[in-house]
Amino acid sequence: LDSFSDESRKILKTGEDLAPQTLDPDSDTLLILTPLKNSAKHLAKYFELIDKLKYPRHKISLAILVSDSTDNTLQQVVKAKKKYQERGPKEKRFGRFEIYRQDFFYTLPRNDRHLYKNQFDRRSLMARARNYLWTRALENEQWVLWIDGDLVEYAPSLVNDMIAFDKDVLVANCVVLKTYGTYKGKKIVYDLNSWQETPESMEMLKKLKEDDFLVEGDGTPFTTHRKHLNGFGKDDIIVPLDGVGGTFTLIKSHVHRSGVGFPAWLYEHQVETEGFAKLAKAHGFGVFGLPNHHVRHESE
């Protein structure tokens, strides 16, 4: 301490005095975050899957945002909270169960939501919803898990498995069971937002205008040449990524606490979860994916 100024020594002394009263993140608590819109029909399966998680229930907190719903999503979530936190057995109670309501007054027919012309407004609104949720719900948890409300299958041990990798940002591979067409009866990739840049995609990026907006998939004006999470092999246990989706994404809470959220504006030609991944990497955090750890989305 001899080399410190008097002011620096005072700062250090204050820190020592306050340390016992400062809350450090609990090393294994988990906050599940889910934004919902018109999701009443999915909620039974949503809670069924969470109930099957092998992670200790008392270490799990749950925060749900209900937005722009015209069905009884909110009423169903309130009913679920009473069931778990008041009427049900104590061993089934969550650490916290928070419900938020915020409308953004944006409507879009479900069948049109993947059209390129709608993507920027849609994804920007989703970014706003995610930011609204995590900035209000995150308290002292160490881990944040973003889960889509319309998943129908994932392994009970998946959270434990993902935490064991100890990565800043880690995403599972989201697939869907096709019920029609060429791939009927087969599981194919659903979430193309988890990807890795390639030499070809890096060349493509150099040719873009500043306000060009990139979206993965068919029907877009740009061929990105990126390698999607489903493009890796069986031996690729964990791979570095440059973009992520939000269907089942585990994040160390200090990533959010450092100020990394979901951009509702263009950041390196991306918004929302893909923009989040770009921001996280710019802040020095690691972003990874698990090609062979699957979650299954509701069929369309």
Model-predicted regions and their roles:
Residues 1-52:
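N-proximal low-complexity "stem/linker" segments adjacent to membrane-targeting elements
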Residues 29-30, 53-64, 85-89, 95-97:
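Short loop->beta transition adjacent to catalytic acidic/histidine clusters or analogous donor-positioning motifs
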Residues 34-36, 66, 147, 291:
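Short beta-strand/turn micro-motifs composed of small residues
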Residues 48-59, 69, 79-84:
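Short, acidic, metal-binding catalytic loop of nucleotide-sugar glycosyltransferases
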Residues 72, 127, 131, 135, ...:
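Acidic donor-binding/catalytic loop of UDP-sugar-dependent glycosyltransferases
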Residues 72-141:
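Active-site-proximal specificity loops/subdomain of glycosyltransferases
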Residues 134, 152-253, 257-263:
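Conserved catalytic core of nucleotide-sugar-dependent glycosyltransferases
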Residues 238-241, 246-257, 264-267, 274-296:
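Catalytic donor-sugar/metal-binding loop of nucleotide-sugar-dependent glycosyltransferases
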